[in-house]
Protein backbone atom coordinates (compact mmCIF):
# COMPACT_ATOMS: atom_id res chain seq x y z
CA UNK A 1 0.00 0.00 0.00
CA UNK A 2 1.32 3.45 -0.93
CA UNK A 3 0.38 6.58 0.99
CA UNK A 4 2.22 9.72 -0.09
CA UNK A 5 0.86 11.91 2.71
CA UNK A 6 3.60 13.60 4.66
CA UNK A 7 3.73 12.90 8.40
CA UNK A 8 1.74 9.66 8.30
CA UNK A 9 2.80 6.87 10.66
CA UNK A 10 2.35 3.11 10.16
CA UNK A 11 0.33 2.88 13.39
CA UNK A 12 -2.44 4.89 11.71
CA UNK A 13 -3.26 1.97 9.38
CA UNK A 14 -5.05 -1.32 9.95
CA UNK A 15 -3.51 -3.60 7.36
CA UNK A 16 -4.11 -7.17 6.32
CA UNK A 17 -1.32 -9.59 7.11
CA UNK A 18 1.66 -9.46 4.70
CA UNK A 19 0.69 -6.01 3.41
CA UNK A 20 3.69 -3.76 2.78
CA UNK A 21 3.34 -0.08 3.52
CA UNK A 22 5.24 2.63 1.62
CA UNK A 23 4.86 6.00 3.34
CA UNK A 24 5.91 9.55 2.70
CA UNK A 25 6.47 12.21 0.13
CA UNK A 26 9.10 10.21 -1.76
CA UNK A 27 6.18 8.26 -3.23
CA UNK A 28 4.38 11.32 -4.60
CA UNK A 29 3.71 10.91 -8.30
CA UNK A 30 4.69 14.28 -9.72
CA UNK A 31 5.07 14.86 -13.44
CA UNK A 32 8.65 14.80 -14.80
CA UNK A 33 8.48 18.53 -15.69
CA UNK A 34 7.61 19.35 -12.09
CA UNK A 35 10.44 17.21 -10.73
CA UNK A 36 12.91 18.83 -13.14
CA UNK A 37 11.79 22.32 -12.09
CA UNK A 38 12.04 21.34 -8.42
CA UNK A 39 15.75 20.67 -8.84
CA UNK A 40 16.34 24.26 -10.01
CA UNK A 41 16.57 27.21 -7.68
CA UNK A 42 13.27 28.69 -6.57
CA UNK A 43 12.35 32.22 -7.50
CA UNK A 44 9.47 34.32 -6.38
CA UNK A 45 7.87 37.23 -8.12
CA UNK A 46 7.45 40.71 -6.74
CA UNK A 47 4.27 41.14 -8.77
CA UNK A 48 1.03 41.92 -7.01
CA UNK A 49 -0.65 38.79 -8.31
CA UNK A 50 -2.27 36.07 -6.23
CA UNK A 51 -3.17 32.83 -7.97
CA UNK A 52 -6.03 30.59 -6.89
CA UNK A 53 -5.49 27.03 -8.07
CA UNK A 54 -8.18 24.37 -8.00
CA UNK A 55 -7.61 20.69 -7.63
CA UNK A 56 -10.47 18.24 -7.84
CA UNK A 57 -12.74 20.59 -5.93
CA UNK A 58 -16.23 21.77 -6.72
CA UNK A 59 -14.44 24.39 -8.73
CA UNK A 60 -16.89 27.16 -9.60
CA UNK A 61 -18.38 27.54 -6.14
CA UNK A 62 -15.03 27.35 -4.38
CA UNK A 63 -13.36 29.80 -6.77
CA UNK A 64 -16.24 32.28 -6.42
CA UNK A 65 -15.94 32.11 -2.61
CA UNK A 66 -12.16 32.61 -2.75
CA UNK A 67 -12.44 35.56 -5.16
CA UNK A 68 -15.03 37.19 -2.92
CA UNK A 69 -12.86 36.58 0.14
CA UNK A 70 -9.76 38.01 -1.54
CA UNK A 71 -11.68 41.17 -2.53
CA UNK A 72 -12.12 41.88 1.19
CA UNK A 73 -8.65 40.80 2.29
CA UNK A 74 -6.59 42.34 -0.53
CA UNK A 75 -8.72 44.87 -2.46
CA UNK A 76 -7.29 45.74 -5.85
CA UNK A 77 -4.85 42.85 -6.08
CA UNK A 78 -4.81 41.09 -9.45
CA UNK A 79 -6.19 37.56 -9.09
CA UNK A 80 -5.39 34.71 -11.41
CA UNK A 81 -7.47 31.52 -11.40
CA UNK A 82 -5.97 28.28 -12.69
CA UNK A 83 -8.29 25.32 -13.16
CA UNK A 84 -7.99 22.00 -14.92
CA UNK A 85 -11.22 22.47 -16.80
CA UNK A 86 -12.54 25.74 -18.16
CA UNK A 87 -14.80 27.57 -15.72
CA UNK A 88 -17.85 29.57 -16.70
CA UNK A 89 -16.10 32.88 -16.09
CA UNK A 90 -19.17 35.11 -16.21
CA UNK A 91 -20.93 32.93 -13.65
CA UNK A 92 -17.92 32.86 -11.30
CA UNK A 93 -17.47 36.63 -11.56
CA UNK A 94 -21.18 37.23 -10.90
CA UNK A 95 -21.18 34.96 -7.83
CA UNK A 96 -18.03 36.56 -6.45
CA UNK A 97 -19.08 40.13 -7.31
CA UNK A 98 -15.70 40.69 -8.94
CA UNK A 99 -14.86 42.79 -11.97
CA UNK A 100 -13.28 41.15 -14.99
CA UNK A 101 -10.46 43.72 -14.82
CA UNK A 102 -9.18 42.20 -11.55
CA UNK A 103 -9.43 38.52 -12.48
CA UNK A 104 -7.73 36.45 -15.18
CA UNK A 105 -8.67 32.83 -15.86
CA UNK A 106 -6.40 30.03 -17.10
CA UNK A 107 -7.34 26.42 -17.78
CA UNK A 108 -5.99 23.31 -19.42
CA UNK A 109 -2.33 24.35 -19.09
CA UNK A 110 0.40 21.79 -19.54
CA UNK A 111 3.01 21.34 -16.80
CA UNK A 112 5.51 23.81 -18.32
CA UNK A 113 2.84 26.50 -18.66
CA UNK A 114 1.68 25.91 -15.08
CA UNK A 115 5.22 26.26 -13.77
CA UNK A 116 5.68 29.50 -15.71
CA UNK A 117 2.50 30.92 -14.19
CA UNK A 118 3.52 29.79 -10.69
CA UNK A 119 6.82 31.65 -11.06
CA UNK A 120 4.96 34.86 -12.00
CA UNK A 121 2.87 35.19 -8.84
CA UNK A 122 3.64 36.49 -5.39
CA UNK A 123 1.57 33.82 -3.67
CA UNK A 124 -0.56 30.83 -4.51
CA UNK A 125 -3.78 29.72 -2.77
CA UNK A 126 -4.56 26.03 -3.23
CA UNK A 127 -6.15 23.13 -1.40
CA UNK A 128 -3.68 20.67 0.16
CA UNK A 129 -3.68 18.39 -2.87
CA UNK A 130 -1.36 17.51 -5.73
CA UNK A 131 -1.52 21.06 -7.11
CA UNK A 132 -0.22 22.30 -3.76
CA UNK A 133 2.62 19.76 -3.84
CA UNK A 134 3.58 20.80 -7.37
CA UNK A 135 3.75 24.48 -6.44
CA UNK A 136 5.47 23.66 -3.16
CA UNK A 137 8.11 21.54 -4.90
CA UNK A 138 9.27 24.51 -7.01
CA UNK A 139 9.34 26.94 -4.09
CA UNK A 140 6.16 28.92 -4.73
CA UNK A 141 4.89 30.68 -1.57
CA UNK A 142 1.65 29.02 -0.47
CA UNK A 143 -1.48 29.61 1.50
CA UNK A 144 -3.34 26.34 1.75
CA UNK A 145 -6.04 24.52 3.61
CA UNK A 146 -8.20 21.47 3.27
CA UNK A 147 -11.33 20.74 1.31
CA UNK A 148 -11.39 16.95 1.71
CA UNK A 149 -10.65 15.05 4.92
CA UNK A 150 -7.79 13.11 3.30
CA UNK A 151 -5.87 16.41 2.94
CA UNK A 152 -5.83 17.22 6.65
CA UNK A 153 -2.98 14.97 7.84
CA UNK A 154 -0.38 16.20 5.35
CA UNK A 155 -1.53 19.77 5.81
CA UNK A 156 -1.17 19.56 9.59
CA UNK A 157 2.31 18.08 9.25
CA UNK A 158 3.51 20.74 6.78
CA UNK A 159 2.00 23.48 8.93
CA UNK A 160 3.54 22.18 12.19
CA UNK A 161 6.93 22.26 10.49
CA UNK A 162 6.46 25.84 9.28
CA UNK A 163 6.43 24.92 5.60
CA UNK A 164 3.00 26.29 4.62
CA UNK A 165 0.43 28.76 5.87
CA UNK A 166 -2.55 26.66 6.97
CA UNK A 167 -5.89 28.40 6.50
CA UNK A 168 -7.86 25.40 7.74
CA UNK A 169 -11.21 24.49 6.20
CA UNK A 170 -11.32 26.16 2.78
CA UNK A 171 -14.91 25.07 2.19
CA UNK A 172 -16.15 27.77 4.57
CA UNK A 173 -14.02 30.80 3.80
CA UNK A 174 -15.28 34.16 5.00
CA UNK A 175 -13.88 37.67 5.21
CA UNK A 176 -13.66 37.26 8.99
CA UNK A 177 -11.01 34.50 8.83
Can you name each region flagged by the protein language model?
Residues 14-16, 94-100, 157-159:
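Short, conserved catalytic or adaptor-binding loops enriched in Gly and charged residues
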Residues 1-2, 124, 142:
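Short, well-ordered beta-strand core segments
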Residues 5-8, 27-28, 109-110, 147-152, ...:
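Short, acidic/turn-prone active-site loops that include or flank metal/cofactor-
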Residues 119-130:
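Acidic donor-binding loop of glycosyltransferase active sites
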Residues 2-61, 89:
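A nucleotide-sugar donor-handling region in carbohydrate enzymes
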Residues 44-120:
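Donor-nucleotide binding loops and adjacent catalytic segments primarily
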Residues 132-176:
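Catalytic binding pocket for nucleotide-activated donors in carbohydrate/polymer assembly enzymes
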Residues 115, 122, 139-141:
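A short alpha->beta transition loop at the rim of the catalytic pocket in nucleotide-sugar-dependent
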Amino acid sequence: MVCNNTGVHPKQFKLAQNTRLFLGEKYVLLRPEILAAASQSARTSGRRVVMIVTGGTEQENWVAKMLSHMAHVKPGVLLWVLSGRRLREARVLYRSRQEKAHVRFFSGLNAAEMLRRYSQVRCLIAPASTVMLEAFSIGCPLVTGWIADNQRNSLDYLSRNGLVINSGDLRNVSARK
